[in-house]
């Protein structure tokens, strides 16, 4: 099994999992917006447009991943999950080719200075240090996309109860 947590969220209850099952933070049900607009409110929407274009190049127009990013209201945030290693490998096979193509398309060359320059150039927000983490925000949406479309997500709430 493999687990990822960020500094603000910790999955304290975990157990053996079947293939295709993932423990996550509780999904956010967005009644008033969709993933695409949620991203647009706080980040550079052209990053999302690039990502969906890359996904369409890889998986074809109208694929389930692009449909999720453009239309879905359920968001599994924070990049917190526990899953079997085989499922993690599949997630990586989905995620990293998209991020690598995004990096190349935007001439970032995996160089932090280039990310800062990009944030200054195309961000409508004053907090460049926040916006320069574009790949992290994009990754969070892509991980949510993959888990939502390919796996059964189980949320473990701090009381130890599960919500599906």
Which residues make up each language-model segment?
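ER/Golgi luminal nucleotide-sugar-dependent glycosyltransferases, focusing on the catalytic module
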Residues: 1-164
């Amino acid at each position: 099994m493999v687990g990822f947590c960020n500094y603000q969220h910790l999955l304290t209850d975990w157990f053996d999992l079947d293939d295709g099952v993932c423990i996550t933070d509780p999904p956010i049900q967005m009644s008033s917006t969709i993933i695409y607009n949620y991203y647009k409110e706080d980040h550079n929407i052209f990053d999302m447009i690039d990502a969906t274009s890359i996904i369409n190049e890889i998986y074809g127009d109208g694929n389930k991943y692009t449909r999720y990013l453009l239309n879905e209201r359920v968001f599994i945030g924070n990049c917190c999950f526990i899953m079997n290693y085989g499922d993690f490998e599949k997630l990586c096979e989905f995620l990293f080719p998209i991020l690598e193509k995004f990096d190349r398309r935007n001439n970032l060359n995996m160089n932090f200075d280039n990310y800062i320059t990009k944030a200054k150039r195309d961000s409508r927000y004053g907090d460049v240090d926040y916006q320069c983490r574009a790949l992290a925000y994009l990754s969070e949406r892509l991980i949510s996309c993959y888990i939502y479309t390919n796996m059964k997500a189980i949320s473990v709430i701090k009381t130890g109860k599960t919500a599906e």
